[in-house]
Amino acid sequence: MKLKTLSVGEVNNYVKKLVENDFILKNLNVKGEISNLKFHSSGHIYFSLKDENSKVNCIMFKNNAVNLDFRLEEGMKVEIKARLGVYHKEGTYQLYCENIKKAGIGELFEEFHKLKKELSEEGIFDEKYKRALPKFPKRIGIITARTGAAVRDIINVIQRRNKSLDIILYPAKVQGENAADSIIEGIRYFNNEKSVDVIILGRGGGSIEELWAFNNRDLAYEIFNSRIPTVSAVGHEVDFTISDFVSDMRAPTPSAAGELVSPSLQEMINDLLNKKEFLHRAVDRRFLNAKRDVDLLHKGLKGNNPTHIIEKRIKEVNTLEEKLNFLGKRKIDKAKDELIALNSILQTLNPLNTLGRGYSVIMDKEDKVINKVSELKKNDMVKVIMKDGSVNIDIKIINE
């Protein structure tokens, strides 16, 4: 007998009828822990119910939700009365809840608060251990997944604020089995290599189980013992993990972490100019003080005529002059060396020097810098500035 070929819709309808006609699946009592909780504006409640090994999607419609005598919370352990249904369009199944009873606080939340209390009593969260982030870092280490919104957000913010900063990514697992060990390896790598000035631990938002790697005791100790300052940027602003409490600073989002660790180029230039001005004033002050001392000695000599006093004072003046010349020369040499170093830094930060490393700048006919392809249209005339000059180019083809 040849079997009939079914459409996808026919398969889903068949499964739907099987499920809806099953007596057990129409009268289920299921216990588990709430995660991914969402209260819809329609009044419906969406969430997942999970245990150690599995999870299932659930929905409670408004007509049943209004009868709840408590508010559902993330991590809450509950027992639900429900029926299993199939969503025909997607071919997925979910539990349709008629009633929910509270069964206690979720085990993960209990474990989180227990660990937080223990580590707090050990003192590793104390403010006295928090280190200030470097004001002007040169290299920034990021420990997060190789792909995803978190790493994109951090890198985009840092490069927007200061393109001269080096960024080193340590790709790590940030969710699931062995994720905490992977993050620990990243911290050890940066500490052993001594290759960065500050470390960002980053991950996008998620449920408590998705962020659980950052609630690991061994990871907390590794962050505490890190010789390099750390910034925890895990989840959204409302999410808190153990790594937030033990790190030197917590950022509410990965993007905010990028802002915290990257001084703008203008801030760096202003700081260098202020130091240069301070050195000038210090040298001038030293010379003025020395000159005043010499003038006072000369006045004292004029008021004492005896030859031996004059000779004595002349010797003192000569000694002071020699000392002044020595100190002045040493101060000038030191100031000169510092100014040369500052000038070298300024030259490094000079955007025009970037052209010498193979980059170029594209400008429109009004000499405005073009950053995006979307700012151009066909037949536009642009000027491309390179190391040794510039060329004018007509735009013929745009690839986006």
UniProtKB/Swiss-Prot annotation:
Subcellular location as annotated: Cytoplasm
Please tell me whether the keyword Cytoplasm is annotated for this protein: yes
Q: Which UniProt keywords apply?
A: Cytoplasm, Exonuclease, Hydrolase, Nuclease
Q: Does the keyword Nucleotide-binding apply?
A: no
Tell me, what is an example of a GO biological process annotation in this record? DNA catabolic process
Pfam families referenced in this protein's UniProt entry, alphabetically: Exonuc_VII_L, tRNA_anti_2
- What GO molecular function terms would the record report? exodeoxyribonuclease VII activity; nucleic acid binding
The protein's Enzyme Commission number = 3.1.11.6
Q: Name one GO cellular component term.
A: exodeoxyribonuclease VII complex
- List the catalytic activities from the record: Exonucleolytic cleavage in either 5'- to 3'- or 3'- to 5'-direction to yield nucleoside 5'-phosphates
Q: What coarse category fits the chief subcellular location reported for this protein?
A: cytoplasm
Fetch the InterPro entries from UniProt. Exonuc_VII_L, Exonuc_VII_lsu_C, OB-fold_nuc-bd_dom
Q: NCBIfam families from the xrefs?
A: xseA
PANTHER family noted in UniProt? EXODEOXYRIBONUCLEASE 7 LARGE SUBUNIT
> Subunit structure of this entry?
Heterooligomer composed of large and small subunits.
As for family, the record states: Belongs to the XseA family.
Q: In UniProt terms, what function does this protein have?
A: Bidirectionally degrades single-stranded DNA into large acid-insoluble oligonucleotides, which are then degraded further into small acid-soluble oligonucleotides.
Task: Give the protein name, as stated in the record.
Answer: Exodeoxyribonuclease 7 large subunit
